[in-house]
Amino acid sequence: MQIETLTVEPLTKEAFAPFGDVIEVEGAQLRLINNGTTERYHDLARMEAAGTQTRVLINIFRGQSFAAPIDIMMMERHPFGSQAFIPLNGRPFLVVVAEDAGAGPARPRAFLARGDQGVNYLRNIWHHPLLALEQKSDFLVVDRAGREDNLEEYFFSDYAYRIETTQTA
């Protein structure tokens, strides 16, 4: 099996834009609400929920921790809805995404999310399942429920991608 190394990039709104949204207060539109006692950081992600008998779900995912090296052997995507991950424990995590290459994902990109950043994968974006770092971590996950199957998986058969370090380049 051929293995190609991925370089970890810092998670920024600009770099992540083709794949979805970085959920963070930095640069967000601020509105004071509740008679000025609460700061609302407005419209942080573009949530999508298409299909039949659709609704938005809120879940808590508890992700097992990973340590480098991490082999990326598969990716998944959700054709009917976006999926957002917001860390609840303030710990960093890895985000691995790829554009569509027609018959599956293109070469993935890896990002290091700080513990105060979340991500929203847009509909049909290839991504690796949750990669918590340091220790088991909880994430608030905004997802889509509906009648249609909202999961497609792709397994790399002749090659894999490896993350040698969880530090950014």
Curated annotation (Swiss-Prot):
Any Gene Ontology biological process: allantoin catabolic process
Cofactor(s) recorded in Swiss-Prot or TrEMBL: Ni(2+)
A molecular function GO annotation: ureidoglycolate hydrolase activity
Reaction equation(s) it catalyzes: (S)-ureidoglycolate = urea + glyoxylate
Keyword Lyase carried by entry: yes
Presence of keyword Secreted: no
Role played: Catalyzes the catabolism of the allantoin degradation intermediate (S)-ureidoglycolate, generating urea and glyoxylate. Involved in the utilization of allantoin as nitrogen source.
Record family assignment: Belongs to the ureidoglycolate lyase family.
UniProt subunit comment: Homodimer.
Protein's name according to its UniProt entry: Ureidoglycolate lyase
